[in-house]
């Protein structure tokens, strides 16, 4: 009896600073976090400040598509 769409979905947060620097090939990698969000409470894309081990600072991590 599973519903068609679950309320909680798994999302991936990616560092926006590393993505911009990846074009110039300055960054050794791209930081990604896996988390969950409630689709009813947060219908828009999620953005959180998380620590990026490649930038060595707290940056904005935005939700990406799978």
Swiss-Prot record:
- Entry keywords, A to Z: Chloroplast, Plastid, Ribonucleoprotein, Ribosomal protein
The listed locations are: Plastid, Chloroplast
Q: What is an annotated GO biological process for this record, any one?
A: translation
Q: Which GO terms describe its molecular function?
A: structural constituent of ribosome
One Pfam family from the record: Ribosomal_L33
Q: Which SUPFAM superfamilies has this protein been placed in?
A: Zn-binding ribosomal proteins (SSF57829)
Q: Does the keyword Ion transport apply?
A: no
Instruction: Read off the PROSITE patterns from this record.
Output: RIBOSOMAL_L33
Superkingdom per UniProt: Eukaryota
Q: Which InterPro entries match?
A: Ribosomal_bL33, Ribosomal_bL33_CS, Ribosomal_bL33_sf, Ribosomal_zn-bd
**What does UniProt give as GO cellular component?**
chloroplast; ribonucleoprotein complex; ribosome
PANTHER family, per this entry? Answer: 50S RIBOSOMAL PROTEIN L33, CHLOROPLASTIC, LARGE RIBOSOMAL SUBUNIT PROTEIN BL33C
What family is it from? Belongs to the bacterial ribosomal protein bL33 family.
* HAMAP family for the chain: Ribosomal_bL33
Protein name, UniProt field: Large ribosomal subunit protein bL33c
The lineage, from the top, is: Eukaryota, Viridiplantae, Streptophyta, Embryophyta, Tracheophyta
- Encoded by which gene? rpl33
């Amino acid at each position: 009896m599973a519903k068609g769409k679950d309320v909680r979905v798994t999302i991936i947060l990616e560092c926006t600073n590393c993505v911009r620097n990846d074009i110039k090939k300055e960054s050794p990698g791209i930081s990604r976090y896996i988390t969950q969000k409630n689709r009813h409470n947060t219908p828009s894309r999620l953005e959180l400040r998380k620590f990026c081990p490649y930038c060595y600072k707290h940056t904005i991590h935005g939700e990406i598509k799978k």
